[in-house]
């Protein structure tokens, strides 16, 4: 077992080395100029992070949920997680896409209600299987 664990650590360590992005100084400058969010990632994964972020943002503009509603969902999540950066961004985007103040307030209230109920269930150790049975 000890030899297996040593081999596993070795293999995982090698994979981590090969998973690193090769980025020239020119590419790094271009990626950093492309998006201020690219400054959040280490150079070793800068290309991969940029590709992931670009694809992730496509969920808003090209996903099966329309863009306004996607931002309202993200706003609710941002409010629940108390993200000072995400909240103003998603409010701005939702408004740009035509969301009303009423829709924004509703999205935040839904998130608050989910958090409240989750806290009540979790804190009172409500039986999960009994809850699932109630939903049938």
Question: Can you say where each PLM-predicted feature lies in the sequence?
Answer:
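Acidic, glycine/proline-rich low-complexity segments that act as flexible tails and inter-domain linkers
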Residues: 4-6, 10, 18-69, 122-136
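Iron-sulfur (Fe-S) cluster-binding segments and ferredoxin-like electron-carrier domains
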Residues: 49, 88-104
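Amphipathic alpha-helical segments within well-ordered protein domains
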Residues: 57, 74, 91-95
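Beta-strand segments within the central parallel beta-sheet cores of soluble alpha/beta enzyme folds
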Residues: 72, 103-109
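Short, thiol/selenol-centered motifs that function as redox-active sites or metal-ligating centers
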Residues: 73, 77-89
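Charged/polar positions within long, soluble alpha-helices
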Residues: 85-88, 92, 116-120
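Short Fe-S-cluster ligation motifs
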Residues: 107-126
């Amino acid at each position: 077992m000890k030899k297996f664990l040593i081999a596993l650590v070795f293999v995982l360590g090698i994979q981590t080395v090969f998973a690193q992005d090769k980025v020239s100084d020119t590419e790094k400058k271009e990626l950093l100029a492309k998006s201020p969010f690219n400054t959040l990632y280490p150079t070793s994964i800068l290309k991969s992070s940029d590709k992931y972020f670009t694809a992730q943002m496509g969920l808003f503009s090209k996903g099966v949920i329309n863009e306004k509603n996607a931002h309202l969902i993200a706003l609710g999540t941002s409010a629940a997680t108390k993200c000072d950066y995400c909240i103003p961004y998603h409010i701005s985007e939702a408004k740009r896409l035509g969301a009303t103040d009423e829709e924004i307030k509703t999205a935040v209230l839904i998130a608050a209600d989910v958090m409240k109920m989750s806290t009540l269930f979790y804190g009172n150790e409500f039986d999960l299987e009994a809850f699932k049975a109630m939903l049938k």
